[in-house]
Amino acid sequence: MSRPIKWRKICCMPLNKTFAPSGSKPQGKITMTIDEYETIRLMDLENCTQETCAMAMNVARTTVQKIYEEARYKLADALINGKELSIEGGEFRLCDGHNQNCVRAVSYTHLRAHET
């Protein structure tokens, strides 16, 4: 029997969900999950440590490390190889903004679950 899904908490949805090379046809498509996007946002944009990111997402630090490695690989593949990057899916729940571990950027807004 498999383990039940442990939902990853995210604080905000991406404002843009598709990125593609300008001036040339994409050389393929990569899908980054919303929880992978959240680790990039928290660790690279908000300068959170893996530990802080793990607390914000309600997962173990080792889980964050794995998610982050996968996200960075996908991001590099899209940038270097000229692939379209789509951000969608994943195992997540949107936070309500009332959690003490919520890490929101000023430029982002919480979206209610029915708006996603």
Can you name each region flagged by the protein language model?
Residues T109-T116:
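Conserved small/polar residues in nucleotide/adenosyl-binding loops
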